[in-house]
């Protein structure tokens, strides 16, 4: 074809063509038929196509035979137009029904296809007259057919999503072009256009084409049907059909719009002709309409009404829309689409609650396709959306302008979560209510809401819609899954996986080549070198040959193979030159330098390898090459060795490039082996003596790198778990606490140790201006600590002698001059081997120079303490000789400065001491290097800038620093990243690292008791303030231009009294003992003001934003020193308390005041408070000379929290003690209880850490302290003292704040009393732990009423900072917000909510037992625990709701609606998900899915892949650490249904159950342990409760180690890398629950209305058939019919009563007389066999009714009294019972009324007398009948009621007809009358009999059979 000049070939073939041409055209075309191609039988499609269509169409003589036309075009021609869509599809070929894979390319009005995209010739199809449709109803194989006038193609896509994409593209290609071509307009055009949506189907009865009016072909009437309007057409006629599908908007109604006089629009009928349902009845004449012989009569698409052609003009104009009127959006109400892509809606008159339907077409074995079409038929098609094709966003955007609407999600739980997430995105919670239709597998949410476990039948969809209309509303809690992911290094040994043979072969070749390259570089043996070279050449040749054979057409691969061969030749040349010694390398190096110099950057940047996201920090064979290189015995010159290594490295890279190109799907596998940072290749020699020798670094100084970004990774990645996998199963859980999580610098708060693994340059400037660089190196190889010799260090080391495994101080001092930076132009391009070689050579060359420099530097070395103390200022300022300005990632022991004192237990940093030649005062303590400095490797903190302030005389710092390795997960706050932000007043550097110290301090003040609840530290005794050297932060930053070191050594701290004695009443109140640490800023830190955390701004629903407000620092002038006296006798233990301190200045604008609240538990009284603390004392001690102006006053706030013993009974005391210069005034607002107050120095600003240190008493037994330490006796412990405090992460520490310690404000306390009694006007800013930036800041110029509106924007949780506080009185904010948020009718939830707030978290007390979960709860200990559950489980102080500031670095992974699982359940879900992805055909039905879950669960029973999960995760509920037993999973439930209907929490049957009843609207989570798959299976059958863990409001899970753990949320599973997971309450959404009581009420009411309407219709019809002059005195035709039944019943009763008396002469004879009298009265109304006529008949009937009623009553009385002694014949008993039953029923129809003339007349009720309440009376239980067996004889002879079987058994034909009419099945009356169906025959009717009677509708058959069953049972 290449030599042809024509662009297009036209091949035409007539039916008379030769056989050869037929064969040739058949091979290359889709159809070889002369007419429209028939659709063959495709076995994959569920609804088969009929093969006789072509035969039936060929019989039509009017249709001429079409010519087959095939068009072909060349590649260059069809590339001219724009391509709409292209890709591969399966094309059906007509020979043997095979499928061929073809490449299709769609353009405007043209479709091209060929074998592949590289073909030069394409078949093209003109789409100008196109018809396309789906194949089949369910369309299992995703096939569709394209029909044009000349071609017909059946195509198959891989998924339904792809099929719908192709159909949408075909729609776009054939639709006229529009000015706006975005996807929304295309979807919108699809909705608003009235085009039909065809699918191929078969029909059970003759069906006719709506276009040509001919019958569809074949016996099954196979053809196309519109999925919306059910329009039927031939396949050949589909393109000719007009766009008259169901209306969607007012514009689509067109000319049929009917407008009334007042301007309102009426909804008209939309008629579709022919193909009416079976037994359709005309709405006008009530006769059957429709035909199976032709296309006739009409049906409405909205109200389902059917009419004759002649009756259609008489039909009402307005359409009632139908039974689903409440849910339908009438097209007349949707006027247009506004600019915001939402409908402009005019609500119709009457009730209107539109329903938005989302259907997942893949759910339930493709049942969703049927539901999707059925909903479009019942509702407006624009209300129904397919989640697979359009998603939920389109429907929500269109419904945005509806005030209230309902959403129905027809799918599984995953799709429900998708829709709810979109509702969050559009913020539409208040205007929509969500319902669920269960089409998925588990359907847990649908079960809980009452909608059942499955819904597979779409026939009863109208009735189901009625249920949703009567549903009630409940709130569903939704929970955010916030995830902080830890970057994990690539493991050294790859995990085993199932790989293909080709991959294994390639991997083996690559490994072999690396092995030989290693020997070539390292070996000294000539024979080994030769053999390795030969084997390398053979391996490379084999690799190139094999890859080239499989990729012959790949030009790029061929180029790469040639490059590989060239690299190999260059390596051989280098080896040859090495042997002959002729290679010098000068020309090669010069060439490389010249090439690199062209693109070298001006300033040295970070190494390119650091920017690789796939950097592996594991050592490979290269490390072994480099480690042995310096010991290589081959005497090579450096240039020769460099050339050889470069050649080997080039060969290795070329091999990797070839393999990566041959396997495009797996590029990362080989990149990881290749991407080795220069730091991995370095191993620094260590000094055996422990001496640290500073040296210059040949490595470049790397700028800080943000490791949070997924594209960044540094060499300082730390591994989460320091243990190997083989030891993880038996190690104490506290061992895993040594975790440093990375955080972005812009998000890391200085108050929390974020453990940022950054190479941070910290500058410490001495007095001489010398600059010292400090760096930290942490665990380069997978988290291990490496010393200089490359040895793996232990995670924690004991004090004592120094061993090679002992951890050194992680700082390397490199005294490098910072004058002119030395730039290595090759640093970014040099290979690793060259890099390492230069480094080692430089190090050896500079060793002598460094020793010479050390001789000049005065250093004092203490071998015993392993410390090296530098003398400050002694380093001469001289330039160092630099070879390369590179960084040394080494771990060496730095010389400790003089102000650092180390011992076996503590490390003290004296920040006030000058670094002079004095020795440490703690020489007597044996030492180890402190690790606190490595943990404080923060940009804002240098080693010497961490200062512990103290009093000069009495106040000191104790043992507070130890075991910094065991840092827990820490929270990350958002600081102000701007450099202009100054330090806030009162801030100190110590506060910035308080969380680091707080969680790593083991024993502050050795003999004193501290717990998790301690928030601040204060000393027992404070000496009087002297004229101190201390100044505030602001003063220091301004006044000290040249700061100097202070030389005061730390004295010993005064200890508190021991509180562990038995007679101490406060021994159980130790949680609130307070110690104090005064913090001062470092002098040198003032030169670079630190940046503190300010108010964080957040992006809604996601992470923290890069915004925050800025707090300008106000100047504060200090007039002088304060030498006021300090009375010693007032400092008693009862005076310790909390102070709220205010400092003021002369200028109001510069006045600043800090509020400080400290809490402690002191047994004091109000009298002690009033007697021991005087107001003038406060005045004397806290007034400074700056208060001369009198502005402001000191306010002391004293707060006492509840203790575990007193709990809620102890109420706090709030004392506001304002102080002025003129006098003192104390206003005390006391709720109850008492406190002491200790005055503080006004010049000091004391603050506490936001995270409390988790400390414990050394003497305290760890068994007793198990609750606070998480001690587990089943696990190994590393260090008894070390493990005691490793119990809680920062989230687990309980924070005591003013918000948690104040009770709810009483209503009697006025708001004015809360904050309006003083002249000070507050501006309150909350501290960063809660909502705002600092604890409190008071400015007199900003009134409180101006500040309070700002707090209203803090729409957080209920327990915010000041909510419930009587100090600030912000209760009205919370209450107003709550009232605004909660709606009416929520009073029932009020009490439970308050109760949960008071008691949560509720922790199962059995978890404290060592043998849990084996404790059955029945023993004495368990009963005692349950009895004291409130005391054991109550929190000392309620945990603050996690604020958004602590979520910095987190991102919302997903939202939980149902449940969260980690471990075995998530593993099963993940395996099932993978199975479904691999084999979707095996997971299409619900039964198969349950089977797969069982198989995968049984697999876990054997494999136990999640064993020892408790050692890999840590669980915290509301901040409390939960000790975990041996388990395999943890499940957190929001709803009481788990994985397919299991009540995993268990039902609560005990009255004394401590847990709250589970609910999905109580904002409470249930935490459950999973011990194995057997428990999961047994929980479906047994009510298990021993596995309960807790009920709480927030959960945090810490994932340890370096392995991913399976996690699932609502059935969607994934592998979660190590890090932290926090589950927090997000919002609530309105869900629709089934209301069965309302359904029953509506059903009964509708039944009564239906009966009433039937009676009216009967009266109207009977009146129309009667004479015009008829009156009430004349018996109507209907009444005459009832009268005949009455006469029959009376005659039968008289007959059988007489026969009874004759058979038993002993009975009363008066009954016989009554029977005779009734017989005579009966004869009087029909003398001589004729009924009386006229008004006399009603009068005579009164006597008959009275006599027959008397006869009935007497007979019943007789049988009741004498029945036990009578012995009747069986036939007589049966007939008498039937006669009495019929008589009772007929008497109910009769009524006697007194007329105006005074006469009594009888009337008959034409309705059936049976009441549903009587007819559905339930039988008594079996035991009741058995118990009343003595009266069985009486019961047997009682006259049966009308609800017995005998009553319907004796029905006549007329009664059966009446029964049919009451069921609205009057269309079958004629058939029943014609076949004389009586009651006896009615009770025996079956499905086949009903079909013979003409009842063919499935629904009618079911209704009749169910009604017959009810008659038989009743």
From Swiss-Prot:
Keywords per UniProt: ATP-binding, Cytoplasm, Kinase, Metal-binding, Nucleotide-binding, Phosphoprotein, Repeat, Transferase, Zinc, Zinc-finger
Record-linked InterPro entries: ATP-NAD_kinase_N, C1-like_sf, DGK, DGKD_4H, Diacylglycerol_kin_accessory, Diacylglycerol_kinase_cat_dom, NAD/diacylglycerol_kinase_sf, PE/DAG-bd
Domain (DAGKc): residue spans on this chain: 350-486
Residue intervals of the SAM domain: 1851-1914
Phosphoprotein is among the record's keywords: yes
Gene3D superfamilies xrefs: 2.60.200.40, 3.30.60.20, Pleckstrin-homology domain (PH domain)/Phosphotyrosine-binding domain (PTB), Probable inorganic polyphosphate/atp-NAD kinase, domain 1, Transcription Factor, Ets-1
Gene Ontology cellular component terms for the protein in this record: cytoplasm; plasma membrane
Subcellular compartments: Cytoplasm
Catalytic activity: a 1,2-diacyl-sn-glycerol + ATP = a 1,2-diacyl-sn-glycero-3-phosphate + ADP + H(+)
Location of the region described as Disordered in the Swiss-Prot/TrEMBL record: 1-37, 621-642, 783-805, 1016-1053, 1116-1135, 1175-1216
Entry EC number(s): 2.7.1.107
Zinc-finger ranges (Phorbol-ester/DAG-type): 195-245, 268-319
Family to which the UniProt record says this protein belongs: Belongs to the eukaryotic diacylglycerol kinase family.
Function summary: Phosphorylates diacylglycerol (DAG) to generate phosphatidic acid (PA).
Name of the molecule in the record: Diacylglycerol kinase eta
């Amino acid at each position: 074809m290449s030599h042809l000049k024509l662009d297009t070939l036209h091949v035409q073939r007539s039916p008379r063509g030769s056989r050869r041409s037929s064969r040739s055209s058949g091979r290359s075309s889709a159809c070889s038929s002369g007419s429209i191609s028939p659709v063959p039988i495709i076995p994959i499609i569920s609804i088969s196509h009929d093969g006789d269509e072509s035969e039936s169409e060929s019989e039509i003589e009017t249709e001429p035979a079409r010519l087959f036309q095939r068009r072909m075009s060349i590649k260059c021609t069809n590339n001219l137009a724009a391509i709409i869509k292209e890709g591969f599809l399966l094309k059906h070929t007509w020979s043997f029904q095979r499928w061929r894979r073809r490449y299709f390319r769609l353009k405007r009005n043209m479709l091209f296809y060929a074998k592949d995209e590289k073909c030069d010739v394409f078949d093209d199809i003109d789409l100008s007259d196109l018809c396309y449709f789906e194949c089949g109803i369910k369309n299992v194989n995703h096939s569709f057919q394209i029909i044009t006038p000349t071609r017909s193609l059946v195509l198959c896509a891989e998924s339904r999503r792809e099929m719908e994409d192709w159909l949408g593209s075909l729609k776009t290609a054939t639709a006229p072009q529009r000015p706006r071509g975005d996807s929304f307009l295309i979807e919108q055009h699809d909705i608003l256009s009235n085009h039909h949506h065809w699918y191929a189907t078969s029909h059970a009865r003759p069906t006719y084409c709506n276009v040509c009016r001919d019958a569809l072909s074949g016996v099954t009437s196979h053809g196309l049907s519109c999925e919306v309007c059910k329009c039927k057409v031939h396949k050949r006629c589909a393109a000719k059909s007009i766009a008259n599908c169901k209306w969607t908007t007012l514009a689509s109604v067109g000319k049929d719009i009917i407008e009334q006089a007042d301007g309102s629009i009426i909804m008209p009928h939309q008629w579709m002709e022919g193909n009416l349902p079976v037994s359709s009845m005309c709405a006008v004449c009530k006769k059957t309409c429709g035909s199976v012989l032709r296309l006739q009569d009409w049906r409405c698409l909205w109200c389902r009404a059917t009419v004759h052609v002649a009756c259609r003009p008489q039909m009402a104009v307005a359409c009632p829309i139908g039974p689903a009127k409440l849910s339908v959006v009438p097209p007349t109400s949707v006027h247009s689409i506004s600019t915001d892509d939402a409908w402009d809606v005019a609500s119709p008159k009457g009730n209107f609650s539109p329903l938005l339907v989302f259907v997942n077409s893949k759910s339930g074995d493709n049942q969703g396709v049927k539901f999707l079409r059925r909903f479009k038929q019942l509702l407006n098609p624009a209300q129904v959306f397919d989640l697979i094709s359009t998603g939920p966003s389109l429907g929500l955007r269109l419904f945005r302008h509806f005030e209230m609407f309902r959403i129905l999600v027809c799918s599984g739980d995953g799709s429900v979560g998708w829709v709810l997430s979109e509702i969050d995105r559009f913020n539409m919670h208040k205007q929509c209510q969500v319902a669920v239709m269960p089409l998925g597998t588990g359907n847990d949410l649908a079960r809980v809401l009452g909608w059942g476990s499955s819904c597979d039948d779409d026939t009863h969809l109208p009735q189901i819609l009625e249920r949703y209309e009567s549903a009630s509303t409940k709130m569903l809690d939704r929970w955010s899954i916030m995830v902080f992911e830890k970057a994990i290094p690539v493991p050294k040994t790859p995990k085993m996986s199932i790989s293909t043979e080709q991959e294994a072969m390639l991997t083996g070749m690559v490994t072999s080549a690396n092995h030989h390259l290693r020997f070539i570089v390292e070996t000294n043996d000539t024979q080994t070198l030769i053999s390795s070279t030969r084997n390398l050449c053979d391996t490379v040749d084999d690799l190139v040959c094999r890859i080239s054979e499989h990729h012959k057409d790949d030009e790029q691969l061929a180029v790469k193979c040639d490059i590989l061969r060239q690299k190999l030749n260059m390596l051989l040349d280098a080896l040859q030159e090495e042997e002959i010694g002729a290679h010098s390398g000068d020309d090669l190096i010069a060439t490389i330098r010249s090439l690199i110099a062209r693109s070298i950057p001006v300033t040295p940047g970070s190494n390119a390898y650091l920017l690789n996201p796939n950097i592996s920090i594991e050592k490979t064979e290269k490390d072994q090459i480099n480690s042995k290189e310096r010991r290589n015995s081959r005497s090579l010159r450096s240039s020769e060795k460099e050339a050889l290594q470069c050649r080997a490295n080039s060969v290795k890279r070329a091999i990797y490039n070839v393999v990566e190109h041959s396997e495009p799907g797996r590029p990362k596998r080989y990149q990881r082996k290749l991407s080795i940072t220069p730091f991995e290749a370095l191993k620094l020699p260590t000094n055996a003596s422990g001496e640290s020798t500073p040296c210059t670094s040949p490595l470049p100084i790397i700028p800080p790198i943000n490791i949070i970004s997924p594209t960044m990774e540094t060499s300082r990645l730390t591994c989460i778990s320091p243990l190997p996998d083989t030891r993880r199963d038996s190690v104490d859980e506290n061992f895993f606490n040594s975790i440093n999580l990375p955080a972005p610098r812009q998000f890391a708060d200085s108050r929390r140790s974020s453990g940022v693994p950054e190479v941070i340059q910290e500058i410490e400037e001495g007095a001489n201006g010398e600059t010292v660089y400090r760096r930290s190196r942490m665990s380069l190889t997978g988290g291990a600590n490496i010393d200089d010799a490359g040895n793996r260090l232990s995670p924690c080391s004991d004090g004592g002698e120094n061993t090679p495994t002992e951890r050194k101080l992680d700082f390397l001092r490199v005294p490098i001059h910072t004058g002119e930076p030395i730039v290595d132009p090759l640093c970014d391009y040099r290979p690793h081997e060259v890099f390492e070689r230069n480094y080692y050579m430089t190090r050896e060359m500079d060793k002598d120079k460094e020793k010479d420099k050390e001789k000049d530097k005065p250093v004092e070395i203490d071998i015993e303490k392993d410390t090296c103390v530098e003398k400050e200022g002694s380093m001469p300022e001289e330039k160092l000789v630099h070879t390369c300005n590179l960084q040394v990632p080494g771990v060496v022991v730095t010389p400790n400065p003089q102000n650092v004192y180390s011992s076996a237990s503590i490390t003290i940093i004296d920040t006030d001491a000058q670094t002079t030649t004095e020795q440490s005062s703690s020489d007597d303590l044996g030492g180890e290097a402190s690790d606190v400095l490595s943990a404080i490797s923060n940009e804002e903190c240098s080693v010497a800038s961490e200062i512990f302030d103290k009093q000069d005389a009495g106040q000191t710092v104790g043992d507070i620093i130890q075991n910094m390795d065991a840092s827990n997960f820490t929270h990350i706050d958002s600081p102000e990243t701007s450099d202009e932000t100054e330090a806030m007043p009162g801030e100190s550097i110590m506060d910035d690292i308080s969380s680091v110290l707080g969680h790593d301090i083991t024993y502050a003040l050795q003999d004193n008791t501290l717990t998790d609840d301690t928030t601040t530290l204060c000393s027992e005794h404070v000496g009087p303030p002297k004229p101190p050297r201390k100044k505030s932060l602001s003063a220091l930053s301004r006044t000290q231009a040249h700061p100097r070191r202070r030389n005061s050594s730390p004295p010993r701290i005064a200890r508190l009294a021991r509180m562990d004695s038995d007679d101490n009443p406060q021994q159980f109140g130790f949680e609130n003992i307070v110690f104090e640490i005064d913090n001062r800023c470092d002098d040198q830190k003032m030169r670079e003001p630190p940046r503190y955390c300010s108010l964080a701004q957040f992006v809604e629903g996601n992470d923290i934003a890069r915004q925050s407000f800025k707090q300008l620092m106000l100047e504060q002038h200090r007039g002088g020193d304060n030498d006021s006296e300090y009375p010693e006798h007032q400092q008693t233990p009862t005076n310790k308390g909390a102070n709220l301190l205010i400092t003021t200045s002369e200028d109001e604008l510069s006045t600043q005041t800090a509020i400080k609240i400290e809490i402690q538990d002191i047994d004091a009284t109000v009298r002690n408070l009033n007697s021991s603390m005087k107001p003038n004392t406060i005045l004397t001690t806290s007034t400074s000379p700056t208060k001369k102006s009198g502005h402001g006053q000191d306010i002391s706030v004293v707060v006492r929290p509840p203790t575990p013993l007193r709990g809620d009974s102890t109420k706090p005391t709030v004392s506001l003690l304002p102080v002025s210069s003129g006098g003192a005034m104390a206003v005390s607002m006391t709720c109850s209880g008492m406190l002491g107050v200790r005055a503080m120095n006004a010049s000091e600003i004391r603050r506490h850490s936001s995270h409390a240190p988790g400390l414990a008493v050394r003497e305290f037994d760890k068994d007793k302290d198990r609750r606070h330490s998480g001690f587990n006796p089943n696990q190994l412990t590393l260090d008894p003292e070390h493990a005691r405090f490793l119990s809680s992460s920062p989230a687990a520490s309980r924070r005591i704040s003013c918000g948690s310690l104040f009770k709810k404000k009483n209503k009697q306390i006025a708001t004015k009393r809360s904050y309006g009694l003083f002249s000070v006007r507050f501006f309150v800013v909350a501290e960063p732990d809660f909502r705002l930036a600092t604890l409190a800041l008071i400015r007199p110029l900003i009134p409180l009423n101006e500040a309070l509106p700002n707090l209203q924007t803090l729409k957080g949780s209920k327990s915010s900072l000041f909510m419930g506080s009587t100090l600030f009185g912000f209760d009205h904010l919370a209450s107003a917000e709550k009232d605004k948020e909660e709606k009416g009718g929520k009073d029932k939830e009020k009490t439970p909510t308050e109760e949960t707030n008071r008691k949560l978290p509720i922790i199962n007390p059995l978890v404290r037992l060592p043998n849990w979960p084996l404790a059955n709860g029945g023993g004495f200990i368990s009963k005692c625990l349950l009895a004291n559950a409130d005391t054991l489980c109550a929190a000392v102080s309620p945990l603050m709701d996690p604020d958004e500031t602590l979520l910095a670095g987190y991102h919302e992974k997903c939202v939980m609606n149902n449940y969260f699982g980690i471990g075995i359940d998530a593993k099963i879900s993940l395996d099932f998900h993978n199975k479904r992805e691999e084999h979707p055909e095996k997971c299409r039905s619900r039964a198969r899915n349950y089977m797969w879950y069982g198989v995968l669960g049984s697999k876990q029973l054997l494999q136990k892949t999640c064993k020892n999960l408790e050692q890999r995760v840590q669980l915290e509920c509301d901040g409390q650490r939960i000790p975990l037993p041996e388990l395999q999973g943890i499940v957190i439930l929001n709803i009481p249904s788990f994985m397919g209907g299991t009540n995993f929490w268990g039902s609560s049957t005990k009255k004394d159950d401590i847990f709250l009843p589970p609910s999905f609207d109580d904002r409470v989570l249930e935490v459950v342990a999973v011990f194995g798959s057997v428990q999961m299976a047994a929980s479906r059958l047994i009510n298990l409760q021993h596995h309960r863990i807790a009920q709480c409001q927030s959960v945090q899970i810490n994932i340890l180690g370096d392995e991913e753990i399976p996690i699932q949320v609502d059935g969607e599973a994934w592998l979660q890398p190590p890090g932290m997971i926090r589950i927090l309450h997000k919002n609530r959404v309105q869900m629709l629950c089934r209301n069965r009581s309302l359904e029953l009420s509506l059903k009964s009411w509708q039944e009564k209305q239906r009966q009433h309407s039937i009676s009216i219709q009967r009266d109207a019809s009977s009146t129309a058939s009667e004479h015009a002059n008829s009156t009430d005195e004349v018996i109507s035709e209907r009444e005459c019919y009832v009268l005949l039944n009455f006469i029959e019943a009376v005659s039968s009763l008289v007959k059988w009563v007489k026969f009874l008396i004759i058979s038993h002469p002993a009975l009363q004879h008066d009954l016989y007389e009554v029977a005779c009298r009734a017989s005579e009265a009966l004869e009087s109304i029909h003398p001589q066999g004729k009924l009386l006529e006229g008004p006399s008949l009603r009068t005579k009937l009164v006597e008959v009714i009275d006599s027959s009623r008397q006869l009935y009553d007497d007979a019943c009385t007789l049988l009741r009294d004498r029945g036990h002694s009578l012995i009747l014949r069986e036939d007589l008993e049966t007939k008498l019972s039937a006669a009495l039953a019929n008589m009772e029923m007929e008497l109910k129809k009769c009524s006697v009324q007194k007329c105006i003339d005074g006469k009594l007349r009888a009337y008959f009720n034409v309705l059936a007398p049976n009441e549903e309440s009587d007819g559905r009376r339930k039988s008594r239980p079996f035991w009741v009948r058995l118990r009343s067996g003595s009266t069985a004889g009486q019961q047997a002879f009682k006259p049966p009621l009308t609800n017995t079987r005998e009553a319907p058994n004796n029905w006549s034909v007329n009664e059966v007809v009446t029964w049919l009419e009451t069921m609205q099945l009057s269309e079958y009356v004629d058939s029943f009358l014609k076949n004389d169906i009586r009651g006896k025959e009615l009770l025996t009717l079956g499905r086949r009999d009903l079909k013979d009677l003409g009842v063919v509708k499935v629904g009618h058959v079911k209704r009749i059979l169910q009604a017959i069953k009810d008659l038989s049972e009743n």
